[in-house]
Regions:
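Generic N-terminal leader segments that precede the first folded domain
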Residues: 1-177, 181, 185-188, 638-649, ...
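Membrane-cytosol interface segments
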Residues: 1-52, 92, 303-384, 391, ...
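Hydrophobic alpha-helical transmembrane segments
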Residues: 2-19, 38-49, 206-226, 240-258, ...
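Bilayer-spanning, highly hydrophobic alpha-helical transmembrane segments
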Residues: 58-83, 122-129, 254-316, 402, ...
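Membrane-interfacial helix-loop-helix connectors in multipass membrane proteins
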Residues: 79-115, 205-215, 286-298, 413-463, ...
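Juxtamembrane/interface alpha-helical elements of multi-pass membrane proteins
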Residues: 106, 111-211, 222, 330-363, ...
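Short, Lys/Arg-enriched, Gly/Pro-containing loop segments at transmembrane-helix junctions
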Residues: 144, 322-332, 634-636, 692-694
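Juxtamembrane boundary at the C-terminal end of a transmembrane helix
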Residues: 709-712
Length: 712
């Protein structure tokens, strides 16, 4: 299968190269190879670490743009022909012209309109195709720059720890290049420096200078430039890194402040964006009462515009808000087989025994016994397993939700039609028709004889079974176990800074790092103290301290913890007295605590704004349903029952144009979608993860359900 995938990728790349070769002459005609645009794209390709050369990339972009433009040009021609020829849409400018000129304009009008529509659609297609490909390196370079800026403070602290440990400049660069499991894109930038010196016979000063010009991060470029000055002048590298470490800690706080200010602006924008569909729905309902048919626009607003605005807002927030980079796992290249296997172990991988199966039967039996033991452990404490693996709840809850829904549909307990079935006026063709059909039989009181109820007749129950039941069965367990998982892992980082200070103080008294962990575990309480005690026991039984630290980190796989463990484990390899390194780790952790505390306090207001905006929308929808639609329907029924001419005419007009049950269903669906979107947005703005919004989704959706049970 891997060979097949590789072949498919090669075919795609070959096709892209053919498009680039085909449109290369057009590139030469349109663009100057020494121009600003070509140079800018070349720079972004380098910053994004994309292997394409600028000539072929722009040529390929032109080809994709031309193909997309031709396709949309054909769509525009067909749409124009359908509108102006088949439908006969009349377009008149109203210019005063002579009769002869009017005849000429009338003759050329339709061909010109069709041509112009095709031209407009073709231009849009070319812009989308060409612009999208050109935007890719800009987007990737920007994302890399943001990640580098986020990790630079910790990366400089890591380099400082290496310098304190006695490593020279080249060794620091090489160690930084190998730390890609922790420092991500920052390590990739240093990999470029090391590889240039290793494979291209370039001295490392020139390589640093070149990378300073190619990196997408201005902060890293300035750091490399200043570092080069220290190297050239023979200055104190340790003092330089200590100064830069403090500077970038302050810079990290300033960047967090800018991000929070932008999120506050987005929170204010959300109020306007989310209320726009509500205002449009109100206008469309009023237009419907006045006799104008707006079914398509109403459906498009509720089922199209509302989710589109929510998803668009999420995308907009994602451009400025980024989660802590990395997955939190440490995978050193010199790790033992036991550590590597335990890191990859899980439900489908039993760890070290996997590497011995297949050669000897005894290991196959060990694997079977290990699998049985693991299964029994899960069955004895399934809540612990789901706490550590929240997404595995989907393997249980999704089938349960499907079974409940299928059984309910099979028993006829859930409506399966939108409008239901009613008795037909004439049973020649069929005894029942859709309740929305004109052929449905009407009683003397003006009501239709319903044979099978649809979603409009049971808006709350039908929506509950199709939306809320899966929501509660699937999302509630996932949200509970995920929140439990987050809180259990957070217990490690809550006291991390304090315990690092204790480690530093103990190490300063002359204790080794191992003895310091024992001292801290004896004098502290909480989860991290228990982990220190476990770590001490592992080392006493023969494990190296580095591997014990890595196992401790991989158990919780928190990116922030991974950077701290990487810092300490690398420093303790050089010396057992690492007081300065531990103090640096504690200072970096305290800086992260301050940033996290500020983020929580500032984003809480944005969450409140989002929730209050949703509650306002829900209240307006409920009032519109109870105080307007229900009252109008009641007045219509009274007028019809009284038999008055004017009242009867008004009632017939209202009944013909507005279906109260249908509008109630649409309003309920609108507030339900808004609840789901508002919950996801609130969670994403709060912590940078969509999954953290699940608890808000459940709460807001429940409020919507209870409200509509009372008003619907």
């Amino acid at each position: 299968m891997s060979l097949q995938r590789a072949g498919d990728g090669a075919d795609v790349q070959a096709g892209a190269d053919q498009i680039g070769d085909l449109f290369y002459p057009l590139y030469l005609r349109l663009f100057d190879e020494d121009g600003d645009f070509v140079g800018d794209v070349d720079t972004k390709l380098s910053e994004a670490r994309m292997a394409d050369n600028v000539e072929m990339y722009i040529s390929r972009s032109l080809g994709i743009g031309v193909i997309a433009g031709l396709l949309l040009w054909l769509v525009g021609l067909m749409l124009g022909y359908a509108l102006f020829v088949l439908v006969g849409m009349n377009v008149s400018v109203g210019l005063p012209v002579s009769p002869g000129m009017a005849d000429l304009i009338e003759t050329l009008k339709i061909p010109l309109l069709v041509f112009v529509m095709g031209l407009v659609f073709g231009s849009i297609g070319f812009g989308i195709g060409f612009g999208t490909l050109i935007a890719i390196p800009y987007s990737r370079a920007s994302a890399r720059g943001r990640e580098i800026n986020m990790l630079l403070s910790d990366a400089v602290s890591f380099m400082y720890a290496l310098s304190v440990g006695g490593l020279n400049q080249l060794e620091i660069l090489e160690a930084m290049a190998q730390a890609d499991d922790t420092y991500g894109e920052v390590a990739n930038e240093f990999q470029s420096i090391v590889q240039e010196t290793k494979y291209f016979d370039t001295d490392y000063r020139t390589a640093i200078r070149n990378q300073a010009m190619q990196t997408p991060s201005d902060e890293l470029a300035q750091f490399l430039t200043d570092m080069l000055s220290i190297i050239n002048s023979g200055g104190d590298m340790t003092g330089f890194l200590d100064e830069k470490k403090r500077k970038h800690m302050r810079t990290a706080k300033q960047q967090q402040e800018m991000t929070l200010e932008t999120l506050e602006l987005f929170g204010e924008m959300y109020m306007t964006l989310s209320l726009f569909p509500l205002l449009l729905v109100i206008i469309l309902v009023i237009m419907g009462i006045m006799g104008n048919s707006t079914d398509t626009m109403l459906l498009g607003t509720i089922y199209g515009l509302t989710p589109l605005l929510g998803v668009g807002f999420l995308v907009m927030v994602s451009t400025v808000k980024q989660d802590d980079p990395g997955d939190g796992y440490l995978n050193p290249s010199d790790a033992s087989d036991r550590l590597s296997q335990n890191t990859d172990s899980g439900l489908m991988n039993l760890g070290l025994v996997e590497s011995f199966t297949g050669e000897y039967a005894v290991f196959d039996r060990v694997k079977d016994r290990e699998g049985t033991h693991t299964t029994l452990d899960i069955m004895k404490a399934p809540h612990v397993f789901f706490r550590d693996n929240p997404t595995y709840t989907l393997a249980v809850t999704v089938p349960v939700a499907l079974v409940i829904l299928v059984v309910a549909i099979a028993d006829g307990a859930v409506p399966i039609r939108w409008q239901g079935l009613c008795e037909a006026k004439s049973a020649l063709d069929a005894s029942t028709v859709s309740c929305g059909s004109d052929q449905a039989r009407v009683t003397e009181e003006g009501s239709k004889i319903v044979v099978e109820q649809g979603m409009m007749h049971q808006p709350v129950w039908g929506t509950f079974m199709y939306v809320y039941m899966p929501l509660y069965v699937i999302v509630v367990p996932l949200a509970i176990f995920r929140e439990w998982n987050v809180r259990s892992r957070r217990r490690i980082t809550n006291n991390l800074s304090e315990n690092l200070r204790k480690l530093s103080s103990a190490n300063d008294t002359g204790q080794t790092l191992l003895d310091a962990t024992r001292t801290v575990s004896d004098t502290s309480s909480g989860k991290i103290a228990d982990e220190f005690e476990t770590m001490y026991a592992k080392v006493n039984y023969g494990m190296s301290l580095k591997e014990a630290l890595i196992e401790f980190n991989n158990k919780y796989h928190i990116p922030r913890l991974a950077r701290t463990v990487k810092l300490i484990s690398k420093a303790q390899e050089a010396s057992s007295q690492i007081t300065d390194v531990l103090s640096t780790a504690a200072q970096s952790s305290e800086n992260q605590d301050d940033i996290e505390r500020e983020r929580k306090s500032r984003t809480m207001m944005q969450v409140v704004i989002i929730i209050m905006t949703f509650l306002t929308l829900l209240a307006v929808m409920a009032i519109l349903k109870t105080q307007f639609l229900n009252v109008m329907a009641g007045l219509t029924d009274q007028a019809s029952g009284g038999g008055g001419g004017g009242g009867g005419a008004g009632g017939a007009s209202f009944n013909a144009s507005v279906n109260v049950d249908r509008l109630s269903l649409l309003f309920f669906h609108a507030v339900t979608m808004q609840a789901i979107l508002s919950g996801l947005i609130a969670g994403y703005m709060r912590s940078g993860k969509l999954a953290s919004g699940l608890k808000y989704v459940v709460v807001l959706a429940t409020i919507s359900l209870v409200t509509w049970m009372m008003v619907g």
